[in-house]
Amino acid sequence: MSESPLTIVIVDEDPVFRLGLITVLGRETGVQVLGEGETLDDLRQQLETLAPSILLIDPQFPRRSQSAWPLLRQLSSAYPQVKICLLTASLEYDQLLAAKTQGIAAYFPKGTAIADLVTGLKQVHFGQTCWPSLQTVNAPPLSLWEKLIWPLFRDGLGQIEQSLQQVQKSLQVPSLSDFDRLFWRGRERELKFAQWLVRNLLPQRLKTWHKATNILTATTTVLPPSPPSPRRSGVRTITLRPPSNLTALGQILQQMPLQVENLTAIPLELDILQPLKRQELLSLGQQQLETTINELKALRITPAQLPENCLSIVAEMWRSLSLTFFGKYCQPKSEFSLEQIQSLLEVYQPIICREKLVKIPFVVPLFHHLLFGEPLVVNQKAYPLGSTEAQQYSDLYAQNLVIQLANSTMVFILNYFADHEAIKLALYEYSMLSSRQVARFRNDLAWYYQFSRYWLNPKQIFESQHTLLYLTPAGIVTTQVYAPRQQELTQLRAVPWFVTIVLECRDALSPRVRSVIEFVGNGLVFLLTQVVGRAIGLVGKGIIQGIGNTWQESRSQQKRSN
């Protein structure tokens, strides 16, 4: 029997109940209340810093969220050394079944006598479980027929639910056409009707099992990150990568499906990668951005130093990301060493800076905002740190930076190792393994580079816009953001400059040409309908009258002959 003290952390949204419970438990011998809280931040901080033996929590916490049951499942896996006990109002059978199935150590209804509560907590502390309402949980076992049909219903409902999620993600795509949206809406109605029909065909006891399964497999609640604090050994964090200021990118990467699609009309270097490798490269890019921000904070770089060193910082981010990704997946140990890869990166760095990295917009404002807390200026409006608009635009800029860094990493691989067999097998999609497909992919990229250089980029400079890539749960999409680009416009020469002149001439002439075409078109319509049309009508009328007269004369002759 363990002689370690019984330590408890209490989490409940009712402060009066929490205070009374702490006071009563504090009088008990061998029981120590280490902490208490009412928010997700409090819960995470208490578990990481105090490492209690028991977490006493209300499963209805937090009441403003959809469900705390997935949170309990996550806590159980992230902190296996902490035993979770429920202290709440009476639960339904399916909720009790879910709690017992996922390994909750004890359940105490609110109103349980303090002596019984302390006794149950001590039993849990010594490795036992405590279910005062156990007789209500143990329902009669399923019959043979129910055991046979239950997997069919469960798997069918699971497939319907997965299909519904895919349809809903498809409906979230901004560029979806009206016809496609109508199609997916119909598909959604069909799936919901099938789901309702299957659920109504379930026997009553299997409905209870299904509800319990839904509780166990609901979407996991992600605990928000807390400030760094001393932690005891053996305690693990709940979130895989606390994304600090870049919350949206981290959340999307965690929620993103494996089949991340390029939903833009732009060919991206990432398109050649396998879905898992594509997602991994984006995740590494996010981590590299976070690492760079932390390093710059540690170096205490000043706002005056940042603009002149920004390109070097981004280049170092690209170099580190490329080396990490290549070393993790692409290094054929028999042919290349990391030293050789580093030398190739150093040679290629000026080229990638000139062709790709220097063109990434809003990097300096993003770093100023994240490092020094300066307001983010968008459309001549300054949004302070912490505001909703500043968070949205900083997330957008960060996502575009990460995606462009990932694309630049693939540019390096495609230029030096495009046809290397080991690298193709490790990274490329199966449909892109042949040399012909790789050559076609590279040619498509090369054509787009030239098209962008001589048409798209001058056009966007003239229109004072930047095209940014960002992530959605369905995939990668684009958006247009306004920004003054007068200095770039004055620096255009040769073909790009001529493109702006063509656009300006088109803007100047098109309204006049349109009006002339409209006038001529109206004249032609009048001529064809009022003149030619009437003339043709008169001719047709004469022909019909002639046919009628001839027919009448023939009838008259027939009557006379008769």
Swiss-Prot record:
InterPro entries: CheY-like_superfamily (IPR011006), RcsB_transcriptional_reg (IPR051015), Sig_transdc_resp-reg_receiver (IPR001789), Uncharacterised_Ycf55_cyanobac (IPR016837), UPF_Ycf55 (IPR022552). It comes from Synechocystis sp. (strain ATCC 27184 / PCC 6803 / Kazusa). This is Ycf55-like protein. GO terms for biological process: phosphorelay signal transduction system. Belongs to the ycf55 family. Residues 7-125 form the Response regulatory domain.
